């Protein structure tokens, strides 16, 4: 499969009045995403897309693969990092009424995958989201994609929630949302033109 960079941004926390950056996030979309998204969003401006939650939801639920890279700016242990991701995912799943036993079990598997991991600065986690609801996790000492995934989580709601918490209604990275809205219009207009001819 081939991917293109949809957008990138930073995630951090405000500690004692200062914004501390922890993670740089890159969202890569399978190349067929251009045709899929262009059908509805071609011709829209960056400003329109930024204000339209449905645009981000179409990225999250679209019938194409997504690859999300989270590269650490500051050192974090796997459990430290995953705890915050899980809190956000569970809060989202509960808010939309899709948190049941299967999701609790999937989140437990998610936690287990991160237990032995440590992220020094520059290390990365990769989330591969397939349209059939499988979330592949892999860990790298740098930004290169590992050949083997560390865990596979087969739960569509949990898989979607990971990206939802990054670019959805209560996004942890407004930067990333802005970048997607800024980059994608040109790709959609150009890509749709090529596909149509």
Curated annotation (Swiss-Prot):
Ribonucleoprotein recorded as keyword: no
A Gene Ontology BP annotation from the UniProt entry: flavonoid biosynthetic process
InterPro entries, per database record: CFI (IPR044164), Chalcone_isomerase (IPR016087), Chalcone_isomerase_3-sand (IPR016088), Chalcone_isomerase_bundle_sf (IPR016089), Chalcone_isomerase_sf (IPR036298)
Reactions that this protein is recorded to catalyse: a chalcone = a flavanone
EC number, UniProt record: 5.5.1.6
GO MF annotation: an example: chalcone isomerase activity
Keywords, comma-separated and alphabetical: Flavonoid biosynthesis, Isomerase
Keyword Isomerase recorded: yes
Pathway as given in its UniProt record: Secondary metabolite biosynthesis; flavonoid biosynthesis
Site (Important for catalytic activity): 81
Residues where substrate binds: 23, 88, 165
Disulfide bridge partners, by residue number: none
Miscellaneous comment in the UniProt entry for this protein: Part of the biosynthetic pathway for all classes of flavonoids, a large class of secondary plant metabolites, many of which are brightly colored.
Protein family (similarity comment): Belongs to the chalcone isomerase family.
Role summary: Catalyzes the intramolecular cyclization of bicyclic chalcones into tricyclic (S)-flavanones. Responsible for the isomerization of 4,2',4',6'-tetrahydroxychalcone (also termed chalcone) into naringenin.
Protein name (database record): Chalcone--flavanone isomerase 2
Gene source species: Medicago sativa (Alfalfa)
């Amino acid at each position: 499969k081939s991917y293109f960079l949809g957008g990138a941004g930073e995630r951090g926390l405000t500690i004692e009045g200062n914004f501390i950056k922890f993670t740089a996030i890159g969202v890569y979309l399978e190349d067929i995403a251009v045709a899929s998204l262009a059908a509805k969003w071609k011709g829209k401006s960056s400003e329109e897309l930024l204000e339209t939650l449905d645009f981000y939801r179409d990225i999250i639920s679209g019938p194409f693969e997504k690859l999300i890279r989270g590269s650490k700016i500051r050192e974090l242990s796997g459990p430290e990092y995953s705890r915050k991701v899980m809190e956000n995912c569970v809060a989202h799943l509960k808010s939309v009424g899709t948190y049941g036993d299967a999701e609790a079990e999937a989140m437990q598997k998610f936690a287990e995958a991160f237990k032995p991991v440590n992220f020094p600065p520059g290390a990365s986690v990769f989330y591969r989201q397939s349209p059939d609801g499988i979330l592949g996790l892999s860990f790298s000492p740098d930004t290169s994609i590992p050949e083997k995934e560390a865990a596979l989580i087969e739960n569509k709601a949990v898989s979607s929630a990971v990206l939802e918490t990054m670019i959805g209604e209560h996004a942890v990275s407004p930067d990333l949302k802005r970048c997607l809205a800024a980059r994608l219009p040109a790709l959609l207009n150009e890509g749709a033109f090529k596909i149509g001819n």
